[in-house]
Curated annotation (Swiss-Prot):
Keywords: Amino-acid biosynthesis, Cytoplasm, Histidine biosynthesis. The keyword Cytoplasm applies. It comes from Pseudomonas fluorescens (strain Pf0-1). One of its GO terms (biological process) is L-histidine biosynthetic process. This is ATP phosphoribosyltransferase regulatory subunit. The gene is hisZ. The lineage of its organism: Bacteria, Pseudomonadati, Pseudomonadota, Gammaproteobacteria, Pseudomonadales. Disulfide bonds: none annotated. Pfam families: tRNA-synt_His (PF13393). The keyword Magnesium does not apply. Signal peptide: none annotated.
Length: 395
């Protein structure tokens, strides 16, 4: 490797330098404090695990995004975490094994073999919260509200939210007896709003089911979509109607809590279809081509770890949150310059100052006083009448 290439980083892998790294860390603490104030407990998951554990309950998309290695000790295949959510689900289902509702949150770096989108980072700092043990819409409203509170804390402007429910399509597909390749083809066509393909794929179905599946292409827009869905899906199976009622209940409560929030409904939006089981949601802002925070309900994942538990949650990339947010993140500025000295009294004074939260930078041999400014110091320790005192740094 040429010397010049030794400093190159892989595509999508970034360094974070001062002071941006400090801003991200301050934001991380603020968001985790917010989560804690809502009753969410912080957990730390491993960076690397055996692959069968890491990908349990996850879809093919997560498999493709996971860096894989061989453990030299066991010879087993391992993966670097690409999504912390399944790890937290395992903690709830297998490790904690609580009976009642459990609220957990996390923040940590993940690695993606493939980026989510062009120009996306492959090393985001994933941050999120999960609520386990309750299947009601109240839990979905809680995690969505927490996600929006997080965005308000960061002062992210012009937030818009998309809402959908995979149970609507899943219930119709099951009632129609769709499975395998046909269901996947219909799923793909719905994501592209390819109405001609949807019509072709549903031609052999009973008229009422084909009509309702085709209606999913058009059922997207504002609150009026929910009223239209009640009419056009009136003859749908009970699970579909229950899913629609859940979505209506969630939308009503969000409108009360966040009356200024633009809501967009898309009943054909099947983001995370093979992973989620209920409501799905995502937040978008103008000028960004992908969601900046997203989540949904995924009640089945705990079964893969020995105990099925209702679950709902969301995640975001902390670096994106800091970049888009307008909130002022105050960083400590200034400091105290201390001379290079063996004086025990000076050392005691410095220890006291640091314990009080003061930033004290020691001069190294040969450094002139002018170096204090380069170290962002605005004061200095000087000895007066045998005592070390803090005084302003001469300009």
């Amino acid at each position: 490797m040429a010397t010049v290439d030794r400093w190159l980083l892989p595509d999508g892998i970034e360094e974070v330098l001062p002071p941006e790294a400090a801003r991200i860390e301050v934001a991380r603490r603020q968001v985790l404090d917010l989560f804690q104030s809502w009753g969410y407990e912080f957990v730390v998951t491993p960076h690397i695990e055996y692959l069968e554990s890491l990908l349990t309950g996850a879809g093919q998309d997560l498999d493709l995004r996971t860096f894989k290695v061989i453990d030299p000790q066991s010879g087993r295949q391992m993966g670097f975490r690409a999504d912390i959510t399944p790890q937290v689900a395992r903690i709830d289902a297998h490790t904690l094994r609580r009976e009642g509702p459990s609220r957990l949150c996390y923040a940590g770096s993940v690695l993606h073999a493939q980026p989510r989108a062009l120009s996306s980072s492959r090393s985001p700092i994933q941050l999120g919260a999960e609520l386990y043990g309750d299947a009601s819409p109240s839990s979905d409203v809680e995690v969505i509200s927490l996600m929006l509170a997080m965005l308000q804390l960061a002062d992210v402007p012009d937030v818009h939210m998309d809402l959908g429910h995979v149970g609507i399509y899943r219930g119709l597909a099951q009632a129609a007896g769709l499975s395998g390749e046909v269901e996947q083809q219909l799923f793909d066509a719905l994501q592209r709003k390819a109405i001609d393909e949807v019509i072709t794929l549903t031609e052999g179905l009973p008229a009422d089911l084909s009509g309702m599946l085709r209606a999913l292409v058009d059922l997207c827009g504002g609150r009026e979509v929910l009223s239209a869905a009640r009419e056009r899906l009136a003859n749908a199976p009970a699970p579909v109607l229950a899913a629609l009622e859940d979505l209506l209940a969630i939308a009503e409560r969000l409108s009360v809590r966040f009356p200024e929030l633009p809501l967009y409904f898309d009943l054909g939006e099947l983001r995370g279809y093979h992973y989620h089981t209920g409501v799905v949601f995502a937040v978008f802002v103008p000028g960004v081509g992908q969601s900046i925070a997203q989540g949904g309900r995924y009640d089945d994942i705990g079964a893969d770890f020995g105990r099925a538990r209702p679950a709902t949650g969301f995640s975001t990339d902390l670096k994106t949150l800091v970049t888009l947010g307008r909130a002022e993140i105050e960083l400590p500025s200034g400091g105290i310059w201390m001379p290079d000295s063996t004086d025990a009294a000076l050392w005691q004074q410095v220890c006291q100052l640091r314990s009080e939260g003061q930033r004290v930078v020691q001069a190294l041999p040969g450094q002139p006083l002018a170096a204090a400014r380069d170290a962002d110091c605005d004061r200095q320790l000087i000895q007066q009448n045998g005592l070390w005192q803090v005084s302003p740094l001469a300009s």
